[in-house]
Amino acid sequence: MVEPFLGTWKLVSSENFEDYMKELGVNFAARNMAGLVKPTVTISVDGKMMTIRTESSFQDTKISFKLGEEFDETTADNRKVKSTITLENGSMIHVQKWLGKETTIKRKIVDEKMVVECKMNNIVSTRIYEKV
């Protein structure tokens, strides 16, 4: 059920995001810039197609996809990845794979907030968004 995720969300807190970006291989300058911004995320659905648009003063990104189907994604840090997004137990699970590496971005709704857990290897970052 995607309905709880739909709408526009603003980042209100972030924990361990720089370490996560470092694990991804994001360079120092880009990590510093990305760490300062408070992005707005809009999640929408049109039929079977979902869209996640992320907007910030650093960079805007947009992905459109069908749940459970692999798609090509260029990330904000310019990685070319194969992504798959699924719904599992009330969470939206976004898996990115590239060059033998993998990261998982898990979105879930907790107390009307969107909690985003970004994990790569043993590094976990938690980012919390409130609905606008």
UniProtKB/Swiss-Prot annotation:
Tell me if 4Fe-4S is a UniProt keyword of this record: no
Instruction: Indicate whether ATP-binding appears among the record's keywords.
Output: no
Family matches, as CDD domains: FABP9
What are the record's GO terms for cellular component? cytosol; nucleus
Annotated GO MF terms: long-chain fatty acid binding
Residues annotated with Phosphoserine modification: S13, S14, S44, S91
Supply the Pfam families for this chain. Lipocalin
**GO biological process entries:** long-chain fatty acid transport
Specify where it is mainly localized.
cytoplasm
Which PROSITE patterns does this one have? FABP (PS00214)
Subcellular location per the Swiss-Prot or TrEMBL entry:
Cytoplasm
Its keywords, alphabetically, are: Cytoplasm, Lipid-binding, Phosphoprotein, Transport
Residue stretches spanning the membrane: none
The text of the family note is: Belongs to the calycin superfamily. Fatty-acid binding protein (FABP) family.
Which named protein is this?
Answer: Fatty acid-binding protein 9
